[in-house]
């Protein structure tokens, strides 16, 4: 990936941060119901990296996520990631994630995530820059209302990351990531008489600062802090008539503390 392409993507990312995160499309005359919330969350992950070939590796990881100020278990994730780096400046990634998500006090629901990514890499001085474009498909293992929740739900994730190389065991990094919906449900006037319509908008901005600590050639840890600015649009319909009763905009600011451990074979 050339330096000009990386710079263009940086400009696009900055523009999107300014104009795309807070805007809401005018969709109908139905009232807009807005809500906002904040939360403290934590993530703990252990991973095993297995080299398959010179430029190919497989990573198996298990992760726990908490929410509600660390008081509730939110998700349990099992992931298998295949990483292929045929060239110095370009790599590819495929991933499957089994998600067990808590809904309510005792109800757990299953989701399947499928990720495909292209990663461009560029070194500038002591900084290693990378631009990752990832498409994610989320398949829910339960029945959904297509006017409210598409299944699968598709998003595009754009991440710009900078790692700082130095002679110590610590390798600090920062990154910004945008989530863009590709098939979010759009509000329709009547769910009984109108076809399903799709919309796309930026529904999350993620900012992260952290550092990887190399323990030895086989063991490493990662410590990070992230802040998520989430915004999701939705719609409510009258159960009897199917008429659009309101549009919803939910905003959540989540502060996330994470600790990862990885063992390399």
Features from the language model and the residues they span:
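Outer-membrane beta-barrel transmembrane domain signature
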Residues: 133-240, 263-265
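Outer-membrane beta-barrel "beta-signal"
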Residues: 115-118, 213-217, 251-265
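Repeated loop/turn-to-beta-strand initiation elements of outer-membrane beta-barrel proteins
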Residues: 52-60, 88-94, 125-129, 169-172, ...
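Transmembrane beta-strand segments that form the barrel wall of outer-membrane beta-barrel proteins
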Residues: 28-34, 56-70, 75, 91-102, ...
């Amino acid at each position: 990936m050339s330096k000009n392409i990386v710079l263009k993507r940086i400009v696009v990312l900055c523009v999107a941060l300014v104009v795309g995160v807070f805007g809401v499309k005018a969709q109908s005359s139905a009232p807009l119901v807005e809500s906002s919330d904040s939360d403290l969350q934590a993530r703990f992950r252990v991973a095993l990296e297995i080299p398959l070939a010179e430029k190919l590796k497989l990573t198996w990881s298990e992760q726990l996520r908490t929410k509600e100020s660390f008081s509730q278990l939110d998700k349990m994730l099992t992931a298998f990631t295949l990483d292929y780096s045929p060239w110095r400046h370009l790599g590819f990634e495929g991933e499957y994630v089994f998600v067990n998500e808590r809904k309510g006090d005792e109800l757990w629901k299953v989701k399947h995530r499928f990720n495909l990514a292209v990663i461009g890499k560029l070194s500038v001085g002591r900084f290693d820059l990378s631009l990752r474009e990832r498409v994610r498909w989320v398949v829910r293992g339960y029945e959904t209302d297509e006017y409210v929740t598409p299944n699968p739900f598709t998003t595009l994730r754009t991440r710009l990351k900078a790692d700082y190389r130095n002679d110590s065991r610590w390798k600090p990094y920062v990154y910004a990531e945008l989530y863009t919906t590709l098939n979010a449900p759009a509000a329709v006037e009547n769910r009984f008489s109108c076809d399903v319509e799709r919309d796309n908008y930026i529904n999350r901005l993620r900012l992260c600062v952290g550092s990887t600590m190399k323990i030895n050639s086989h063991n490493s840890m990662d410590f990070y802090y992230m802040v998520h600015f989430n915004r999701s649009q939705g719609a409510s319909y009258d159960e009897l008539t199917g008429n659009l009763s309101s549009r919803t905009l939910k905003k959540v600011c989540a502060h996330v503390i994470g600790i990862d451990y990885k063992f390399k074979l």
